[in-house]
């Protein structure tokens, strides 16, 4: 679950560990862990699209959740995201979410 932590500028993700304890971590830390895991498992393979890969892993679920939250209202979603409505439409099309 994502939430905005009080008096901070980062998003927090609640996760559950093996002892069923709810752990809250900044989203940026989870991204770092995921990237570290990904990079450690490359086994010498070359990667040339990591930025696009990482961005799409965040952008697609973000757009999906915001569109659900706004019940498909693109104007409201664009305002929430701080982007132009035409940019939002372009991104929705990119992920076949239109």
UniProtKB/Swiss-Prot annotation:
Matching Pfam families: HTH_8 (PF02954)
Disulfide bonds: none
InterPro entries reported in the protein's UniProt record: Fis_DNA-bd (IPR005412), Homeodomain-like_sf (IPR009057), HTH_Fis (IPR002197), Trans_regulatory_Fis (IPR050207)
GO molecular function: DNA-binding transcription factor activity; sequence-specific DNA binding
Keywords: Activator, DNA-binding, Transcription, Transcription regulation
Record keyword DNA-binding present: yes
Keyword Transcription regulation part of the UniProt annotation: yes
Record-annotated DNA-binding residue ranges: 74-93
Function per UniProt: Activates ribosomal RNA transcription. Plays a direct role in upstream activation of rRNA promoters.
Subunit (UniProt): Homodimer.
Similarity remark: Belongs to the transcriptional regulatory Fis family.
Protein name as catalogued: DNA-binding protein Fis
Organism: Buchnera aphidicola subsp. Acyrthosiphon pisum (strain APS)
